[in-house]
């Protein structure tokens, strides 16, 4: 598996910073970048008690995060997918 691009690493850091602002236990937030060949998969982990905050009411927060990643992907010329792991 190839190493993530510098774009993907920067996106992961930005995503981690945003998610840390949303949760009660920011020290438990991590974002791992997985190179899928045709794009990057960003796996967010957070404390189980914070999962609802990351997902948001009716999934609005995680959908907003995905929308931000889509916009960033257009700028970077990459593809980013997001999933919350528990």
Residue ranges of predicted features:
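RNA-contacting regions in translation and RNA-metabolism proteins
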Residues: 1-51, 64-86
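Glycine-centered tight-turn and secondary-structure capping sites
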Residues: 55-59
